[in-house]
Amino acid sequence: MFCSCLEIVFFLAGRHHSQFPSLPDENETNKSSDSPPTVFSSLPDELILNCLARVSRFYRPSLSLVNKEFQSLIASPDLEATRSRIGVTENHLYVCLESNKNNPNPRWFTLAPIPKEQKVKPIIPSFPYQHPTSSTFVSIGSEIYIIGGFVKRKRSRRVLVLDCRSHQCRRLPNMALPRVSAAADVIDGKIYVVGGSKSKNIDNWGEVFDPETQTWEPIFPTTVDLTTQKSVFPGKLVMGGKVYDMDGLKVNLNLNSCVVEIDNMMCQISVCKGILVWYDSEEDLVWNKSMVFDRLGLDWTKEGKTEIWCAEISLERRGFGELWGFVEWSKKVFTYDGCDSPSDFFLHSAIVTY
């Protein structure tokens, strides 16, 4: 939808799509060209905004170069209000990277999903707080919640939220107990947090946060349909409101793997080895292994530089016990000086919708 709307916008602006770069350099974004009158000049602003609202946000820097009228409309808060009114949303991938070891505040980046030009761009301003290690991340709408973790080597009750619309970070009310590597899930608009504390008292088993009232309440094993496990992988082994016990399934979880739930299947993807390991909770109790990458080797470090690669993989069921993976695209999205392993700089990722 976004591509077709973009072509319509360029047509009405009196220019061809190929005349504009997908994402201009930063020094070009402040420039605007004086264009002759176009079809847009005779259209009401409401209709123009309705058209622009259907175009991906990542094309806005290019559209701002069309003329001063476009630049003004794109900067107007009415554009986001129009998107909200007509129900246009996009999924945005955010990643948190520690690319500078001398800076205790890591940077958040977002992936620009423009076809053939995918790249990671830093958000501004940078993260204002010291980033807790072993924290848990969940997202609701356009906000990413950062729950607990180690701060100055101590378990923390702190909860932060990053608003991905404004790129502003703020603190929320603290949890009742400090928690590290807790499991978390969003159920009916509320954030359930389980485990991660030293307490063995069942009264401290978990707690739930209500974003509407901004309050925490304790939860018990009978409050919601949840089951505990001895070692909870940070917020990843949560499916449909249940924390699944993987004990005995012989799955090795590490920082080079991504664990997600798709259609009631728990999928673990090994980034460096190009291997997909998956588990279907309805059909079997064993982990199955599938090869999903054409390229099985991946160089994270090269000649004193670190390269970050990103891939989009679509999964498809094909009969009993079969899961096929297709690499939609795969490319380098970010490079910085220094040779580190992925666990040294990659902290967290989250998908937000707005």
Swiss-Prot record:
Segments spanning the bilayer are: none
Superkingdom of the organism of origin: Eukaryota
Q: Which Pfam families match?
A: F-box, Kelch_FKB95
State the UniProt keywords alphabetically.
Kelch repeat, Repeat
Q: Enumerate the spans annotated as F-box domain.
A: 37-86
Which InterPro entries does the entry mention? F-box-like_dom_sf (IPR036047), F-box/kelch-repeat_ARATH (IPR050354), F-box_dom (IPR001810), Kelch-typ_b-propeller (IPR015915), Kelch_1 (IPR006652)
Renumbered ranges of Kelch repeats: 143-189, 190-236
CDD domains, alphabetized: F-box_AtAFR-like (cd22152)
Tell me which stretches of the chain form a coiled coil: none
Name of the protein in question: Putative F-box/kelch-repeat protein At5g03000
Q: Which organism is it from?
A: Arabidopsis thaliana
